[in-house]
Amino acid sequence: MASLSLAPVNIFKAGADEERAETARLSSFIGAIAIGDLVKSTLGPKGMDKILLSSGRDAALMVTNDGATILKNIGVDNPAAKVLVDMSRVQDDEVGDGTTSVTVLAAELLREAESLIAKKIHPQTIISGWREATKAAREALLSSAVDHGSDEARFWQDLMNIAGTTLSSKLLTHHKDHFTKLAVEAVLRLKGSGNLEAIHVIKKLGGSLADSYLDEGFLLDKKIGVNQPKRIENAKILIANTGMDTDKIKIFGSRVRVDSTAKVAEIEHAEKEKMKEKVERILKHGINCFINRQLIYNYPEQLFGAAGVMAIEHADFAGVERLALVTGGEIASTFDHPELVKLGSCKLIEEVMIGEDKLIHFSGVALGEACTIVLRGATQQILDEAERSLHDALCVLAQTVKDPRTVYGGGCSEMLMAHAVTQLANRTPGKEAVAMESFAKALRMLPTIIADNAGYDSADLVAQLRAAHSEGHITAGLDMKEGTIGDMAVLGITESFQVKRQVLLSAAEAAEVILRVDNIIKAAPRKRVPDHHPC
């Protein structure tokens, strides 16, 4: 019998790459920890910002401390790093805030796992311990949650505190009170629906952030056509996505040969008649306002003006979609059956000035909760970051209106969970207890990083905070204004229960997924097949 060759056999295509066992695990740990280190300096009320500069001729500049935005705009090649980037994006989509916290917690868990594996503790043992730790942490968080949903005054104060806590780590922190009030008023107008599409945010250069305001209505950043009414009461609105520029022949590759200018005039006349018929079909809907996503050329604009109809062109797709939502209409593309088209309505449409720009204001819209937040600022970067910050606050508030449970911030919740996990580890025999203790240590790293970013002695503060929780002061947290331990209930540093819960579960799941990896296989790049049949 022939002996088997001991030479390694490569079963992959040429160009494919494979990392095995410790090499694969180390590669995953390094990538994930690097992502955590990248964003951890942005954590907390005194976190730093990042400048993101895209390459190319039209290099865009972005200044932000939003974890999801940073990770979304950096290109990562490491598979484990991509897992954390995707997790951060999901956190942003689900609850709107906690994107940096979830990334940092997952990275710290993997940092702890790296040292445990170096001590010859099996990944499955670590995962088993982490699952028990996650369960204990979630129960501790749930038991500490406070629900003021039935008390209107206290719930309103909770919303103000949550918005203030969310904005305290953002660019808007210096105008926190102003924007907290704006965000809470806007979300309470939704009457519990949580439909953030009804809140429109417009950015206008000029003035300062303090000049931003909430407008009870809908603002469209467009201009009304020439020689048309600038104000309409009891508006009936047809919202359309149709071509109103057919003053040219639109047959691909067509050519027309004429032997006189009279023939050219005939073609133009035919085109005008065709457009006139289309405008007449639109006017049969009994409207006094026509809003089109596409361009409206001069001739149809004149026809609308002569009929006393306000025509608004080039309302971008997002604007048209939101306008259909708030006015109660539907977007139409054909106009042969007026009875099938649902028109939008509002009490008043008028042109208004903001700074040096003209906008169209819709008031008394069908969707009564619709409103617009107008952001003012000195530079485009400030406006963009203000919009991102406000979006986070609005998402968290909408989530809190649905689930009114709140927990305390300032590292209080993390220390509370860490204390519960440590107590469980002390009662658990075997190596799983070591994994549980590592989970608690990772949770304690969040208040440590918050204190470090503020320039305080994190070792001293976290030791004091840990001692306070051990003595039963479950509302103790970090007061980053004074650099001491404070009572979060008194300071009003409150966060949404759903945000904290999502941070805990997402980070634990992502860390577990990465820890399970013992092989990374990169597929061979696809080769281009030469085209043997050129056109």
Curated annotation (Swiss-Prot):
List the GO biological process terms: binding of sperm to zona pellucida; chaperone mediated protein folding independent of cofactor; chaperone-mediated protein complex assembly; positive regulation of telomerase RNA localization to Cajal body; positive regulation of telomere maintenance via telomerase; protein stabilization; scaRNA localization to Cajal body
Q: What is its main location?
A: cytoplasm
Where would you find this protein in the cell?
Cytoplasm
Give residues for the crosslink Glycyl lysine isopeptide (Lys-Gly) (interchain with G-Cter in SUMO2).
248
MF terms in GO: ATP binding; ATP hydrolysis activity; ATP-dependent protein folding chaperone; ubiquitin protein ligase binding; unfolded protein binding
Catalytically driven reaction(s):
ATP + H2O = ADP + phosphate + H(+)
Phosphoserine found at: 3, 260
Q: Which residues carry this modification: N-acetylalanine?
A: 2
The EC number(s) given in the record are 3.6.1.-
Q: Which residues carry this modification: Phosphothreonine?
A: 261
Q: Which domain of life is it from?
A: Eukaryota
Q: Which residues bind Mg(2+)?
A: 97
Give the matching CDD domains: TCP1_beta
PROSITE patterns, alphabetically? Answer: TCP1_1, TCP1_2, TCP1_3
Chain positions recorded as ATP binding sites: 44, 98-100, 495, 500
Output the Pfam families linked to this UniProt entry: Cpn60_TCP1
The record's comment on protein family reads: Belongs to the TCP-1 chaperonin family.
Instruction: Spell out the subunit comment.
Output: Component of the chaperonin-containing T-complex (TRiC), a hexadecamer composed of two identical back-to-back stacked rings enclosing a protein folding chamber. Each ring is made up of eight different subunits: TCP1/CCT1, CCT2, CCT3, CCT4, CCT5, CCT6A/CCT6, CCT7, CCT8. Interacts with PACRG. Interacts with FLCN. Interacts with DLEC1. Interacts with SVEP1.
Specify the protein name: T-complex protein 1 subunit beta
User: What is the source species?
Assistant: Mus musculus (Mouse)
